[in-house]
Amino acid sequence: FINRLIPHILDKEYINKKLVEADQLALKYTNDIATTTGNPILDEYFRQSYLDNFLRGGYPIVVSGSNDDKVLHLFSRKHGDPERDYNQFSTAAEFYSQGDGNFRDVLQNRRCDIIFHPEINEFDIRQFYSLVQIDGYTPMYVKACTFSVIKKHKEDVYKFLDDTVLHGKSKIISALEDRFTAGSLANVILSNNISITISIDEFLHSILDFCQQNYESSTEKVGNYIDQWDYLLDMILCYQRIYPEKIEDLIFKSKVYKYFDSDQTVKPRNEKYFFDGKKARQLDAFYVNTKKYELGYKAEDTNWLKTSSGEIYYTNLIEKLIAIIVNKIALLDPCQMGIEMEANRAGWNDACNGLPSLFGSGMSENFEVARTCHFVKDVLTKYSNHTITVPEELFELYAKVNDSIATCSSGFELWDALATARETYRDKTCYSISGQTVAMDIPDFIHSLDIYINLLSDGVIKAMQLGD
């Protein structure tokens, strides 16, 4: 087939036409950031940066509906560096094409979406904070969202198909029985020559209105990166700039967040610390937990943390923020300067890949934890009338962290106590949580945040002194 197209593709007129189309397409999508300054090169730099951003994070398209709005991120993909084979990428060969990307990369490139596209509202925040695990880590990949028909709307879907599909309805029904993407459904219609009475766009938009949107993600057998979560707070701060009047509802009232459930389990220290008589090393810091598969974990699905009764656990954003803070404080290194690289991976900088084996820690993450502490302190001080609950397992970790900080007399003793507390917590939350929650005293937690902030600040001072 491709060989037959060669004469057409090599035709100069065809090539010139495609160049014009490419320019027009780039201009269309970068008009969001069109800027006129005294320097035309700077103007084009803005456009190019914006283009590069959404070619990795995706360009948000809102599909409005009578039930709720859906958001599709067109063009999303892993960044493709020609010199690094492991950064190869692919996008689906379909309309509304989306691809998979690394969590950190996609998060980095979507964190300002709300500024250019206020119509997406809370979507990005809900997606990425839901993918944060109960241990504060995140999965490796963010995948294209899928859709599934809501059970109560099945009859509405059948009626809609009766009204709009002239023939081939059974193939569409078959496609709707499982999770699907907007593009895959369009492919079913086109590849089977199914006749519909409205445009494909109208048809897809109507179908999606009867569906729930599913966040999709997966792990890679490499461990957990220390910095995957670093840009999460930026999303909230950008949202606050656009919708300051909605920040209270965002933080406290929307109980739609879940916890991603990973098949990767971080080993306790006695299983990853090695000493050969001369040198200590931290190696093979995680394992793929096959017991989870025996309990129903599905590698091909996106798995969510469940309670002991088998129900997916839902919560609000304030709990997710608290979970991040407490887990990260429990990861302070023996000098309380940085956050430990204890799960097999460093951060984005590949030159640091050897640091986890050398018990490395990250100062950048210290700054991010401190920023998150300051933000949570501000919102809790301003909106102190809310009741905050957290899973009893998380509350127990929080209590042990505070007790350790209050009673330990040395940095190493504190590190050992914090590490023991987090290992116990991970054992209790590895497969499920009880589902029982504990109310937190807001003034007490604000006081704890002050302690954490001071501890982190002291760590920065130590690092600066060490650097001098």
Name each model-derived stretch:
Residues 1-468:
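Acidic, mature catalytic/reactive cores of soluble proteins
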